[in-house]
From Swiss-Prot:
<keyword id="KW-1199">Hemostasis impairing toxin</keyword>
<dbReference type="GO" id="GO:0008237">
    <property type="term" value="F:metallopeptidase activity"/>
</dbReference>
<dbReference type="GO" id="GO:0005576">
    <property type="term" value="C:extracellular region"/>
</dbReference>
<keyword id="KW-1205">Fibrinolytic toxin</keyword>
<keyword id="KW-0378">Hydrolase</keyword>
<keyword id="KW-1201">Platelet aggregation inhibiting toxin</keyword>
<dbReference type="GO" id="GO:0006508">
    <property type="term" value="P:proteolysis"/>
</dbReference>
<protein>
    <recommendedName>
        <fullName>Hementin</fullName>
        <ecNumber>3.4.24.-</ecNumber>
    </recommendedName>
</protein>
<keyword id="KW-0482">Metalloprotease</keyword>
<comment type="function">
    <text>Metalloprotease with anticoagulant activity. Cleaves fibrinogen Aalpha (FGA), gamma (FGG) and Bbeta (FGB) chains after positions 'Asn-121', 'Lys-160' and 'Pro-102', respectively. Breaks down cross-linked and non-cross-linked fibrin clots. Prevents and reverts platelet aggregation induced by ADP and collagen. Prevents thrombin-induced platelet clotting. Does not affect plasma levels of coagulation factors prothrombin (F2), V (F5), VII (F7), VIII (F8), IX (F9), X (F10), XI (F11), XII (F12), plasma kallikrein (KLKB1) and kininogen-1 (KNG1).</text>
</comment>
<keyword id="KW-0964">Secreted</keyword>
<keyword id="KW-0645">Protease</keyword>
<dbReference type="GO" id="GO:0090729">
    <property type="term" value="F:toxin activity"/>
</dbReference>
<keyword id="KW-0800">Toxin</keyword>
Amino acid sequence: TTLTEPEPDLTYLTFVXIVXXEMPIFVMATANSGITSTF
């Protein structure tokens, strides 16, 4: 994302939504416990 982008959050949420849509369970697990556990 660029600093000139007004609302990067909406863009990110839109992307997540699309991806997530494929496998929301996996995305949720990775976003919540995956990052805190792996990293």
